[in-house]
Amino acid sequence: VIGGDICNINEHNFLVALYE
């Protein structure tokens, strides 16, 4: 993907945790 993947992944994991 684009630069700043780690931030995006952390944000994605956080949102996934909310929906799980």
UniProtKB/Swiss-Prot annotation:
Gene Ontology cellular component annotations, sorted alphabetically: extracellular region
Subunit structure: Monomer.
Chief location of this protein within or outside the cell: secreted
GO MF terms held by the record: serine-type peptidase activity; toxin activity
Record entry for activity regulation: Strongly inhibited by PMSF and moderately inhibited by leupeptin. Not inhibited by EDTA, aprotinin, pepstatin, and bestatin.
Name of the protein described by the UniProt record: Thrombin-like enzyme Cdc SII
Expression sites by tissue: Expressed by the venom gland.
Similarity annotation: Belongs to the peptidase S1 family. Snake venom subfamily.
GO biological process: proteolysis
Enzyme Commission no: 3.4.21.-
Biological function: Thrombin-like snake venom serine protease that coagulates human plasma and bovine fibrinogen by hydrolysis of the alpha chains (FGA) (minimum coagulation dose is 60 ug on fibrinogen). Has fibrinogenolytic activities, and degrades preferentially the Aalpha chain (FGA). Shows amidolytic activity toward N-benzoyl-L-Arg-p-nitroanilide, has a higher activity than Cdc SI. In vivo, intravenous injection induces defibrin(ogen)ation and a loss of the righting reflex and opisthotoxins, together with a typical gyroxin-like effect (18-20 minutes).
Presence of keyword Hydrolase: yes
